[in-house]
Amino acid sequence: MSNFTIYHNPRCSKSRQTLEILNKKNAQVEIVLYLENPPSAKELQSLLVKLGLCSRDIIRKGEDEYKHLNLKDNNLTENELNNFMSENPKLIERPIVVKGDKAVIGRPPENVLSLF
């Protein structure tokens, strides 16, 4: 069983840098390529609890999908936002690193050090 799970996009420099930090610390890492295998809305809610954040905190507001889906609408519920992110994983901020019941966003990549 892995000590850490990283929701990783290999095309993202911050995601690669975060994974490099984990590897240098000799951490056992499960890599989830979340663009290929997006988390369900329920899994996203669990991640948010571990992050101590709400859905709006992890939505990439600069993505075209954010504008096209009108996600700026403040009347959308957490469940609705999680469903949109699950269906459009490009909207999920990256990387997210989980260890046990805690998680961080690797922006900056050094944030992951707080999990050690």
Residue ranges of predicted features:
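Class I S-adenosyl-L-methionine
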Residues: R16-L19, N23, K67, L113
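A structure-centric signal for secondary-structure junctions around beta-strands
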Residues: M1-N3, I92-E93
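Short glycine-rich hinge loops at helix-strand junctions in the catalytic core
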Residues: N26
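Thiol/selenol-based redox catalytic cores and closely related redox-interacting motifs
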Residues: E36-F116
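Local sequence-structure signature of Cys/Sec-based thiol-disulfide redox active-site neighborhoods
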Residues: S2-I21, V29-Y34
